[in-house]
């Protein structure tokens, strides 16, 4: 998948792809998009953002995700699940 992240605006989402300057815009809710992408490769980290887990470059102490050229803040509602993913993804 070339999807870096998805951002939502009411009943539309913008899908940002690797190598593309402009996002794809489609008429679908974030909830519906989250269900379509829920393969374990994507995670919602904010009310308005879903990120491709394999495209994350880094995460800082303030739970900001660096993906592509974007910095996305992981909000409190999603922080616990995201931190659990990070722990599980770390090599033992």
Predicted regions and their residues:
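Conserved binding/recognition cores within well-folded domains
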Residues: 1-67, 73-74
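Hydrophobic side chains in well-ordered alpha-helices
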Residues: 33, 82-85
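Generic C-terminal helix-cap and adjacent flexible tail
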Residues: 87-92
């Amino acid at each position: 998948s070339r999807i870096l992240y998805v951002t939502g605006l009411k009943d539309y989402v913008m899908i940002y792809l690797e190598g593309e300057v402009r996002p794809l815009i489609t008429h679908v809710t974030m909830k519906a998009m989250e269900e379509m992408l829920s393969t374990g490769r994507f995670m919602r980290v904010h009310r308005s953002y879903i990120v491709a887990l394999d495209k994350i470059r880094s995460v800082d102490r303030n739970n900001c995700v660096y993906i592509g050229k974007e910095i996305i803040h992981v909000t409190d509602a999603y922080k616990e699940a995201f931190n659990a993913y990070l722990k599980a993804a770390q090599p033992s």
